[in-house]
C-alpha cells in the first residue's frame, strides 16, 4: 500500500477516534466511558485504539487538547484587541476557563493527566506544549499592555498560569461558575499589580 494512502487511513481512524471519544466524554463523562465503547463507536478494534492512545487518560488528552488549542486561539485574538493588562489577561483566560468547565469532571481529570500523566506519550507532550504556549501568550500580552519588562512579564505570566491551574483544580471551585473563577483570578492578578480589579 502506498505511504500516502496508509497515512490517510491513519488520520481517518484518528479522526474517528477523536469524534467518538469527544462525543462519549461530553455526554457521559470520562469516568463513565470505557475504551471498548470508544472503539465500538469509532468502528475499530481496541487493539487499534491503543495504537493511538495507550489509556483512557491519553484519549481524554487527545480530545481536550484540541479544545484547549481552540480556546487559546480565541483568547489570543480577543487579547489583541485589548489595551489594558487586566482586560487582556481576562480575554486570554476566559475561553480556557469555559473550555475546562464545559464538563467539570472531564476538566479536572484533564488537569490531573497534564500534571501527572506519562510525559513520554505524544498527547501528554502536546498538552504541555499548550501550557507553554499559553504562558508565552500571557507574557507577550502583559509586556504589550503594561509597563513591565520582559522578565517581569514572564514572571507574572507564570503566576497567572499557576492561579488558573489552581482555580480550576481547587475542590472549593467545583460549584463556582466560570464568571466567578475569571473574576477571582482577575482580583488576584490586580493585587499582584497593586491596582484595583475593576480599574
Description of each model-found segment:
Residues 111, 128, 143-189, 199:
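Hydrophobic/aromatic-rich alpha-helical bundle segments in the mid-to-C-terminal region
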Residues 42-53:
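Short hydrophobic/aromatic patch on the recognition helix
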Residues 100-121, 169-172:
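Amphipathic alpha-helical segments used for helix-helix packing
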Residues 53, 60-67:
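Alpha-helical DNA-contacting segments of helix-turn-helix folds
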Residues 1-28, 32-41, 58-61:
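Basic, helix-initiating cap at the start of DNA-binding domains
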Residues 69-72, 102, 119-147, 154-158, ...:
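Amphipathic alpha-helical packing segments from all-alpha helical-bundle domains
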Residues 62, 76-102, 156-160:
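Hydrophobic alpha-helical connector segments
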Amino acid at each position: 500500500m502506498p505511504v500516502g494512502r496508509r497515512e490517510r487511513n491513519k488520520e481517518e481512524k484518528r479522526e474517528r477516534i477523536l469524534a467518538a471519544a469527544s462525543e462519549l466524554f461530553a455526554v457521559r463523562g470520562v469516568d463513565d466511558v470505557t475504551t471498548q465503547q470508544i472503539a465500538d463507536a469509532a468502528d475499530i478494534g481496541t487493539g487499534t485504539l491503543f495504537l493511538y492512545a495507550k489509556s483512557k487518560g491519553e484519549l481524554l488528552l487527545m480530545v481536550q487538547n484540541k479544545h484547549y488549542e481552540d480556546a487559546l486561539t480565541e483568547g489570543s485574538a480577543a487579547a489583541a484587541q485589548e489595551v489594558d493588562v487586566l482586560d487582556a489577561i481576562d480575554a486570554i483566560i476566559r475561553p480556557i476557563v469555559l473550555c475546562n468547565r464545559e464538563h467539570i469532571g472531564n476538566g479536572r481529570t484533564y488537569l490531573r493527566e497534564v500534571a501527572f500523566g506519562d510525559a513520554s506519550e505524544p498527547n501528554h507532550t502536546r498538552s504541555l506544549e499548550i501550557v507553554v504556549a499559553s504562558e508565552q501568550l500571557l507574557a507577550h500580552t502583559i509586556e504589550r499592555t503594561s509597563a513591565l519588562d520582559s522578565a517581569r512579564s514572564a514572571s507574572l505570566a507564570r503566576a497567572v498560569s499557576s492561579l488558573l491551574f489552581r482555580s480550576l483544580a481547587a475542590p472549593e471551585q467545583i460549584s463556582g461558575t466560570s464568571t466567578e473563577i475569571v473574576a477571582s483570578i482577575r482580583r488576584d492578578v490586580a493585587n499582584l499589580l497593586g491596582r484595583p480589579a475593576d480599574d
